[in-house]
Amino acid sequence: MSEHSNPELPPLPYDYDALEPHISEQVLTWHHDTHHQGYVNGLESAEETLAENRDAGDFGSSAAAMGNVTHNGCGHYLHTLFWENMDPNGGGEPEGELLDRIEEDFGSYEGWKGEFEAAASAAGGWALLVYDPVAKQLRNVPVDKHDQGALWGSHPILALDVWEHSYYYDYGPARGDFIDAFFEVVDWDKAAEEYEKSVSHFE
């Protein structure tokens, strides 16, 4: 395995019960300690398989391992952003340059939010607000699993996990209630930071 590949589970940036009543301590514990850890483990295992195959010159299992890298790698990266995109003191609406860009690209904050909620309702994995460096604009992207439907080259700035393990214990089949709850704890400062990072890099 490359010396640069050393995936680790990051700690939550808040206590496990900090997002209650919107997301329960139990769900955060399962989600972070079991599900996210599983993607970290899967990524590490797939990287090890690829390294072993290169050393042995036997690539029979490499295609499956490469698929596991993208699945688990995207799961790891998106979960890391998802935790950072929430805060016990979050909520409200974006401000400053990010709000200006949302209004420019979507017509209004309400126009963006309605489209994002539609993506979150339809996706089989994630709803993402991304910066598209080719078109130089923000886009909402519904992603199945962790890596199906992603837009090449885009940089996620806001991630909402809509896998059932994210909400079913708290909300049952009412995904819409979970989406509403996310907006009660969303950290727009983190989203603005990711947006500014994207613009400075690509523009």
UniProtKB/Swiss-Prot annotation:
Disulfide bonds: none annotated. Keywords: Manganese, Metal-binding, Oxidoreductase. Mn(2+) binds at residues 31, 79, 161, 165. Its cofactor is Mn(2+). It is an enzyme of class 1 (oxidoreductase). It catalyses: 2 superoxide + 2 H(+) = H2O2 + O2. Gene3D superfamilies: Fe,Mn superoxide dismutase (SOD) domain (1.10.287.990), Iron/manganese superoxide dismutase, C-terminal domain (3.55.40.20). It comes from the Archaea. Binds 1 Mn(2+) ion per subunit. It holds the Pfam family Sod_Fe_N. Its EC number is 1.15.1.1. InterPro entries: Fe/Mn_Superoxide_Dismutase, Mn/Fe_SOD, Mn/Fe_SOD_BS, Mn/Fe_SOD_C, Mn/Fe_SOD_N, Mn/Fe_SOD_N_sf, SOD_C_sf, Superox_dis_Halo. GO terms for molecular function: metal ion binding; superoxide dismutase activity. Belongs to the iron/manganese superoxide dismutase family. Destroys superoxide anion radicals which are normally produced within the cells and which are toxic to biological systems. This is Superoxide dismutase [Mn].
